[in-house]
Amino acid sequence: MIKAGIIGGAGYTAGELIRLLINHPETEIVFINSTSNAGNKITDVHEGLYGECDLTFTDELPLEDIDVLFFCTAHGDTKKFMESHNIPEELKIIDLSMDYRIASPDHDFIYGLPELNRRATCTAKHVANPGCFATCIQLGLLPLAKHLMLNEDVMVNAITGSTGAGVKPGATSHFSWRNNNMSVYKAFEHQHVPEIKQSLKQLQNSFDAEIDFIPYRGDFPRGIFATLVVKTKVALEEIVRMYEEYYAKDSFVHIVDKNIDLKQVVNTNKCLIHLEKHGDKLLIISCIDNLLKGASGQAVHNMNLMFNLEETVGLRLKPSAF
């Protein structure tokens, strides 16, 4: 059994990670660290786990007793922890924050998008889990970058559910504001754009165009629905073939002939992609669950690869479409 520890156990991504790990046939949770909830039952915070989890939060860190450590911490906290603690040499780490997503000679974290870096992830000791928007958008663009087709600015509009803002309530996450409402935030300035560009440049070294990304807050709890527009004269049939070939060995990305809906992916680790051609404009529609494929599900996917398990173990999930 893979023995796992979690640091930062009170948020939405941690709750989903706990749910996935307690139902994973090859994993045992050894500890869930939360300084603000130490001594409390997990179900005091994650009430959806009643009857499934009898663990309590702890402020202890028995790192020698685990094989893999997940960070579900605020941005900046993982880096502080890594710099201030003695990490066992063989301990594998999966960081769900943005601290190590950008490659640097100062760290050895692999960018953990399996559909891009599968081979490197399989042998990695430290993995940086991608951002939710970044995952959804990259999966819509990677095949084009592979074929050196991203030579002009890419227009992206994407809407996310309220869980993307985290568990702490804020002015834009209260039900009375969010319900029946929609708004733009961080237009052209979202923090996930650098990691998107990094990945595209990895496949297409000549890529120097802009990702003109406009994020929206939606009035639903979870999921990301993105539309991307790229100019190309290549026929739709050829583009579909490129996408199907690129994702042929990836279990969680599916190219769909019919138009797609967000509810087809909510509560799953899937990404669905639909392609349309309108004149010289290619419309790419990509959707994921922000908490699963965009966070905790992808973290478990990375764990499976790091421990040489079949990638879908513990991730065969039914969408909550009805």
From Swiss-Prot:
Keyword Transmembrane helix: no
UniProt KW keywords: Amino-acid biosynthesis, Arginine biosynthesis, Cytoplasm, NADP, Oxidoreductase
Pfam family, one: Semialdhyde_dhC_1
EC number from the UniProt entry: 1.2.1.38
Gene Ontology biological-process annotations: L-arginine biosynthetic process
GO function term, MF aspect, one: NADP+ binding
Residue positions of the active site: C132
Family of the protein in this entry: Belongs to the NAGSA dehydrogenase family. Type 1 subfamily.
Name of this chain's protein: N-acetyl-gamma-glutamyl-phosphate reductase
